[in-house]
Amino acid sequence: MIHILFIMVGGGIGAVIRAWLTDVFKSKITSPIPIATLIVNLVGSFLIGFVYGIAQDYQLFSLFFITGVLGGLTTFSTLSYEIVQFISPSFKPVQFFSYSILQFVIGFISCFIGYSI
């Protein structure tokens, strides 16, 4: 039961941080792609790799911070929604491919770099 509580509290914290950062980035940066989600996901991916690399043996901390906080911070559902917007109602190939590549490839590389540090 304590595991669920750690994940729930961490997830709430991460979601609030994501909402706040999204508002900050949207008010300060104009971009043809959803830059707020990109930044949040890339930073989150890096931090997931970094924390996983140093905290594998600390189950409660990993559940709270990786699964909870960073899971709440990063967002696959918003990413999916934003990618669908590039193909509907009219296909925007440059935004679609650049955003997809940045999110998935650079996201993986960010996580790997974080883990390798």
UniProtKB/Swiss-Prot annotation:
InterPro entries assigned to the protein according to its UniProt record, in alphabetical order: FluC
Keyword line: Cell membrane, Ion channel, Ion transport, Membrane, Metal-binding, Sodium, Transmembrane, Transmembrane helix, Transport
Control of this protein's activity: Na(+) is not transported, but it plays an essential structural role and its presence is essential for fluoride channel function.
Molecular function terms from GO: fluoride channel activity; metal ion binding
Any GO BP: cellular detoxification of fluoride
Binding annotation for Na(+): 71, 74
Transmembrane segments: 1-21, 35-55, 60-80, 97-117
Family the UniProt entry places it in: Belongs to the fluoride channel Fluc/FEX (TC 1.A.43) family.
Protein role: Fluoride-specific ion channel. Important for reducing fluoride concentration in the cell, thus reducing its toxicity.
Protein name (Swiss-Prot/TrEMBL): Fluoride-specific ion channel FluC 1
Annotated source species: Staphylococcus haemolyticus (strain JCSC1435)
